[in-house]
């Protein structure tokens, strides 16, 4: 049950992170050229996934290690979804 809760929270965080990245890249070109914003410097500190995991007291390294163990025990359909999640989390380590 805890694993399902963590999986759902991580999935929601990844979706919100993707939505944030999508919206930031939609700045119109003339505005972007007139007033360049230092968003690249701010966003690493405001990473919602890292913030959520840190708030829950979960280390990313332990989560990645646990997901790798889960991938070895799952069936082919479920393992593909967990592999994608593991790939996304491994960028945070």
From Swiss-Prot:
Tissue specificity statement from the Swiss-Prot or TrEMBL entry: Highly expressed in lung and trachea. Detected throughout the airway epithelium in lung, with slightly higher expression in large airways. Found in lung submucosal gland acinus where it localizes to serous-like cells. Probably expressed in club cells of the bronchioles. Not detected in other tissues tested.
Annotated signal sequence range: 1-21
InterPro entries attached to this UniProt entry: Secretoglobin_3A (IPR040301)
Main subcellular location: secreted
Key words of the record: Disulfide bond, Secreted, Signal
Keyword ATP-binding: no
Entry annotated with the keyword Secreted: yes
Top-rank taxon: Eukaryota
Location relative to the cell: Secreted
Cellular component aspect of the GO annotation: endocytic vesicle lumen; extracellular region; extracellular space
Role description: Secreted cytokine-like protein. Binds to the scavenger receptor MARCO. Can also bind to pathogens including the Gram-positive bacterium L.monocytogenes, the Gram-negative bacterium P.aeruginosa, and yeast. Strongly inhibits phospholipase A2 (PLA2G1B) activity. Seems to have anti-inflammatory effects in respiratory epithelium. Also has anti-fibrotic activity in lung. May play a role in fetal lung development and maturation. Promotes branching morphogenesis during early stages of lung development.
Entry similarity comment: Belongs to the secretoglobin family. UGRP subfamily.
UniProt subunit comment: Homodimer; disulfide-linked. Monomer. Interacts with APOA1.
Protein name from the UniProt record: Secretoglobin family 3A member 2
Organism: Homo sapiens
């Amino acid at each position: 049950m805890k694993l399902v809760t963590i999986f759902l929270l991580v999935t929601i965080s990844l979706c919100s992170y993707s939505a944030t990245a999508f919206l930031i890249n939609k700045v119109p070109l003339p505005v972007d050229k007139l007033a360049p914003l230092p968003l690249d410097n701010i966003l690493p500190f405001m990473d919602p996934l890292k913030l959520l995991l840190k708030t829950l007291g979960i280390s990313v390294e332990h989560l990645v290690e646990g997901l790798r163990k889960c991938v070895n025990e799952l069936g082919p359909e479920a393992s593909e979804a967990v592999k994608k999640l593991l790939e996304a989390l491994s960028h945070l380590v």
